[in-house]
A protein has these predicted regions:
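Short hydrophobic beta-strand segments
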Residues: 1-6, 87-90, 142
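Active-site histidine-anchored catalytic micro-motif
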Residues: 63-131, 220
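Catalytic metal-binding/acid-base residues of hydrolase active sites
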Residues: 72, 96-98, 146, 186-188, ...
Length: 258
């Protein structure tokens, strides 16, 4: 596997994201000049660079693993997989739906629209800049998403996107074909991972998350992983919780590569 560290939250570079990456894993840290005049052009520049890196990694016969500060980077990753000739399905593990739109969002937070953008909403903003083809809704599995806003629930009720609880995730529930796994660590209960940007109560524990992640790994169909470390920058990890999570997930990945 090839680890690409993308310490960005949307178009904001976060050198103090403080992700405890293992010292025995080669890591390429990502830093891009984003001189664009607006957020859309800056996101397009960033995700085009991510897409190019993912494409190179796949063509070299290596699994791309992105460690980032948000879920929107998965848009660039999907474009990169497509450029490399893959047609990925999406498994999106998150406490939230990430299915808001500019018209429905109460906060204006673009990270809360990440999956909706990936699925083809307003392609003029980001997708068209990447030549991204939206995945079919029927090949998208949204896992957990316990904190949904009403417009997101309405969208899901009429869409082809499948849903699963974290504990209910099995090989049979996975969509077909190669899989891009977007794993937002805010799916955990906030008591398990302090300092999250958008904590959502009543979430699963670490053991349940690792079990669900292994369901995807054990399928043998993982094409790429975005490990979204969605905590506030500048925070330390005094109890070693982040280190345990990141180290364990990457160790599981390496074990599957042997």
């Amino acid at each position: 596997m090839s680890v690409l560290y993308v310490p960005y939250h949307l178009d904001e570079h976060q050198p103090d994201l403080n992700v405890p990456l293992p010292g025995d894993v080669p890591v390429a840290e990502f830093a891009v000049e984003l001189p664009g005049p607006d957020v859309w052009s800056r996101l397009g520049q960033l995700y085009d660079a991510v897409a190019a890196a993912v494409e190179r990694t796949v063509r070299a016969g290596t699994l791309p693993v992105v460690v980032s500060g948000d879920c929107t980077v998965s848009i660039g990753m999907t474009a990169g997989l497509q450029r490399a000739g893959l047609d990925p399905s999406i498994v999106w593990i998150d406490a939230h739906g990430d299915l808001q739109t500019l018209e429905t969002t109460p906060s204006g937070y673009l990270g809360g629209m990440a999956l909706r953008f990936l699925l083809g909403y307003r392609p003029d903003h980001v997708a068209d800049r990447l030549a991204l083809r939206p995945p079919a809704e029927e090949r998208v599995l949204l896992v957990d998403a316990r904190d949904l806003d009403p417009p997101e629930a309405d969208y899901l009720a009429s869409s082809g996107v499948s849903r699963s609880g974290l504990d209910a995730l099995t090989p049979e529930t996975l969509p077909p074909g190669p899989i891009l796994l977007n794993l937002d660590l805010d799916v955990l209960d906030p008591s398990c991972l302090p300092g999250l940007r958008y904590p959502a109560a009543d979430g699963p524990g670490v053991a349940a998350l690792l079990r669900a992640t292994r369901v995807v790994l054990d399928s043998g169909r993982l094409a790429a992983l975005n490990l979204a470390c969605t905590w506030h920058p500048g925070r330390t990890d005094p109890d070693g919780i982040r280190e345990h999570l990141v180290t364990t997930i990457l160790a599981d990945l390496r074990a599957k590569q042997v």
